[in-house]
Amino acid sequence: MATPLEQWVDEVARETRPKNIYWCDGSEAENQRLIQEMLASGTLGELNQQQYPGCYLHRSDPSDVARTEHLTFICSERQEEAGPTNNWMAPADARAKVGALFRGAMQGRTMYVIPYLMGPAGSPSSKIGVEITDSPYVVANMRIMTRMGEVASRQLGGSGEFVKGLHSLGDLSPERRFILHFPDTKEIWSIGSGYGGNALLGKKCFALRIASVQAREEDWLAEHMLILGIESPAGETYYVAAAFPSACGKTNLAMLVPPASQKGWKVWTIGDDIAWLRRGADGRLWAINPEAGFFGVAPGTSTKTNANAMATVRKNSIFTNTAVTEDGCPWWEGIDGEVPARLTDWRGQPWVKGSSDKAAHPNSRFTAPARQCPSISPHFDDPQGVPISAFIFGGRRARTAPLVFEAFDWDHGVFVGASVASETTAAQSGAVGVVRRDPMAMLPFCGYNMGSYFDHWLKMGTLVPRPPKIFHVNWFRQNADGKFIWPGFGENMRVLHWIIDRCEGKGAAVESPIGMLPSNGGINTEGIDVGGDTMKELLTVGRPDWKAETESIGEFFGKLGARLPDEMGRQREALVKRLG
């Protein structure tokens, strides 16, 4: 008798009518065969194999270069379950409308069946997904981003316990592009886009939108967080998980290289984007990175900003929408070295130095295996994960938020996370530079009602006897001239020191209306150009700014309606009172 997976594959094939069906095993031979086919069809271009062995370039359709949030839907039975921050479509309507687009969508194409694991093999925290796609580019990326093929098929066996992901490029028309999530049946449908976040269904679709629903049902957390380990000169390692909206330096922090001044300290990378956290027998939260690769933004990445990322992408990586140098190397704005006189831009057109157009798309990407990262943690594949000492929230704020502060307690920390805001960037299609509320950096990724999500966080605080301490950071504070006043990058290690000291019951702090701030000298500034006055400015809590902030938070909370937990309102009122 056919397994649930075989039955589903038959069902999809009857609808989409591919010319053939291929079951992926994840082997190197399969990968090489697919790459050769894509080189022949022009889906991939070969990069300089001496300098970038095993690396290739993909150029996407110019209308298909970022996540399309306005075409991303949560299809819960009741609209209230999706809540006001998500687009909602009734499941029956979604299946009828988008099902029609899938009819015959794979004619003349190969249908690939990709079984994959989210999380290390054999981990109690791991889950299985299967993506059906007509894009070999998706197969090649999923092989990097997940533990794919035989390893997942073995773990699945004949079980029906897997998240179904159906993807087709369709005709790539933005008018016929939809990314649908069915939380009640744990299914994902995506059509009309080949872009990473829309097409690699293990990533945001499963690991956050569907997994956040599973986490709520099963009492764990699925979060848009990096995970890093900080090892002291004495050999003690502390793990932190941090949530920032896009373009706030998540990947850079996850792969931080401690500067020479922080002699003896090491940073270990577990993940740069997603964390799944469960309660451990010891009363702490333990985290795994469900992914196996990095899907990072290329522009701005250099040996100065992220030396580990630059080393990671030197082999076996796929570059999407970057420019290419005359000798066949990937290039983007912000990479090391002089700007070349001539390049081929992300559209495949000749580009000359001084052109007003960007040579690489602002949201151009690299897909690279995590195991190639020089700072990858020895616990990257640990089925148990790692114990988390601190949660760090942050956003890109020019003036309001200080460099770092600590929440008073868990419930206050949930409020701090719930009121995260940042300025928009190229990773979202839409206006750039607008301040948008992005609670826990999950606004585009929470698969259910945001008010219920805050409630779930509050509940987790009661279920975890030794919860992480909660902090907020802002690397992006500016002075009156609009200049960044904190050096950032590797020097962020100094802030992490203070955070770890606070977790250890050390580290001097003073109370402020918004939380605990480092006391004078609490952050070591030896060897950097940050004087006492600058540090004072970095840690200033401007009451007029914060009063405006409480208004803005109140407006956002008001949009969440009856599902907003009363505790969030109480926390906001307490902040208003403390500000006086």
Describe every region a protein language model picked out.
Residues 253:
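Hydrophobic positions on the alpha1 helix immediately C-terminal to the Walker A/P-loop
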Residues 1-248, 258-580:
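Conserved internal helical-beta-strand scaffold that buttresses enzyme catalytic cores
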